[in-house]
Curated annotation (Swiss-Prot):
Subunit structure as annotated in this protein's UniProt entry: Part of the 50S ribosomal subunit. Forms a cluster with proteins L3 and L19. In the 70S ribosome, L14 and L19 interact and together make contacts with the 16S rRNA in bridges B5 and B8.
Originating organism: Desulforudis audaxviator (strain MP104C)
Statement: the UniProt record of this protein carries the keyword Ribonucleoprotein: yes
Record protein name field: Large ribosomal subunit protein uL14
One Pfam match: Ribosomal_L14
Taxonomy, superkingdom: Bacteria
Length: 122
């Protein structure tokens, strides 16, 4: 459950380290984002020499959340952190590597490039 003002870790090599959610894309009164949802973020912390600089406004997809999400088979999955991957307008990642596991729900939401780059899909 990501809402406005939530700070997320970045799970790719774009140079951004921390993102703060400033908008959840979807309907106009949407309050929470979960795994696979696209959010608009401001970069709050960045590594020198990266593609994304501090203060940049970027789109990102949520790949890990602390709040558990239910699956159709009755199981639940949750992670130790909130994390996102910076994406372009065509839903492809801006970085070339993904760090850490991602959820299987990204496959159903057509983020196949992120799923293929991830070291583990849970």
């Amino acid at each position: 459950m990501i809402q406005v003002q939530t700070v997320l870790n970045v799970a790719d090599n774009t140079g951004a380290k921390k993102l703060m959610c400033i908008r959840i894309l979807g309907s106009s009164f949407r309050r929470y984002a979960s795994i696979g949802d696209i959010i608009v973020c401001s970069c709050k912390e960045a590594a020198p020499g990266g593609v994304v600089k501090k203060g940049d406004v970027v789109k990102a997809v949520v790949v890990r959340t602390k709040k558990e999400i239910g699956r159709p088979d009755g199981s639940y999955i949750k992670f130790d952190e909130n994390a996102a991957v910076v994406i372009k307008d065509d839903k492809s990642p801006r970085g070339t590597r993904i760090f850490g596991p991602v959820a299987r729900e990204l496959r159903e939401k057509d983020f196949m490039k992120i799923v293929s780059l991830a070291p583990e899909v849970l």
